[in-house]
Amino acid sequence: MSGFGDFTSICETAPLPLCASVGPTLQATGRTGIEPECYARNIELANTIIFEGAASVMHIVALIMTVIMILHVRSKFTAVGRKEILSFFYLYMLLTAMSLIIDAGVAPPGSDPYPYFVSVQNGLSSAVITCLLINGFVGFQLYEDGTPLSVWMMRISSLAAFAISFLVSLATFKSWAGLGPTNTVGLFVVLYLLNAVQLFVYVAMQILLVTRTLQDRWPLGDIAFGIFFFVAGQVLLYAFSSKICIAISHYLDGLFLATVCNLLGVMMVYKYWDSITKEDLEFSVGTRMNNWEVKELLPEEDRRATVFSEDPYAQSSSYDLPYSPGVARYSAKY
């Protein structure tokens, strides 16, 4: 039976990237790692083997969707918490790109740089969660959003979370500071317990914000859907990954489904932020080309039907008369 902080049972079910760097050393190969019971098959493209093909494609889709959400947020120039939520999406984009590099096998398991890539991935995951937590305070107006205090507090907190998770992960993989592949309690606490507490606090704060300060209750639906997608992804990854993989002949596994659910959860974060944020249209400048309604031109016979054309003192312009230079024109002038 696995003890607290042991990744053996987790890695046997879920094909996590860190599983290749934790666990006992295998006598046959002399390498450290825990192999999952089932994982998605690799695909070959242009003489290149791509690991976790389905999950890799989903990472690309997540990158595209994140860019779209960032563009929508950037178009709201006067929205509350605009800079703060952009930091969250930028970090999520970095995490998705790093996950694509690791899952696709650009940094293959067993290589020398692999533990460093996985440590960066773990650090970015903690930074994303911490950044989301700090975003939760913006709606309470404890401090002015968009100010150096707000932005730099978020950046420093996210950087601290990244550094802690990165160093603990690397120390675990490299057997530094009393940690090691078989002593993973610190890694488990940083990656799972601490992040879970931050997510719980964020959700509780947003529910309190909507129920106490907003008249509209529709944002609660966005929160509920976000929780559902995130929890569903974790359950599919850590409880049913191997069963799903075996049932569909190694074409997909829980990593693909977790990536889909995480993307949907992030999209719900954007939808929630958009629903509680009102833009000051008086001072906003839209980036779309159809901000102003363009009417069709009037017919020629109705174009001059105005009060100005009936003024007896109005002087006709040369643009109102047809161009016909003749003798009469020059004789009148000279």
UniProtKB/Swiss-Prot annotation:
Lineage: superkingdom: Eukaryota
Pfam families: Chs7
Topology in membrane: Multi-pass membrane protein
Keywords: Cell wall biogenesis/degradation, Endoplasmic reticulum, Membrane, Protein transport, Transmembrane, Transmembrane helix, Transport, Virulence
Transmembrane segments: 49-69, 85-105, 123-143, 159-179, 185-205, 220-240, 244-264
GO biological process: cell wall organization; protein folding; protein transport
GO cellular component: endoplasmic reticulum membrane
Disruption phenotype: Does not affect conidiation nor nuclear distribution, but leads to increased hyphal hydrophobicity and to reduced virulence on tomato plants.
SS bond list: none
Chief location category: endoplasmic reticulum
Family per record: Belongs to the CHS7 family.
Designated name of the protein: Chitin synthase export chaperone
Lineage: Eukaryota, Fungi, Dikarya, Ascomycota, Pezizomycotina
Encoding gene, per UniProt annotation: chs7
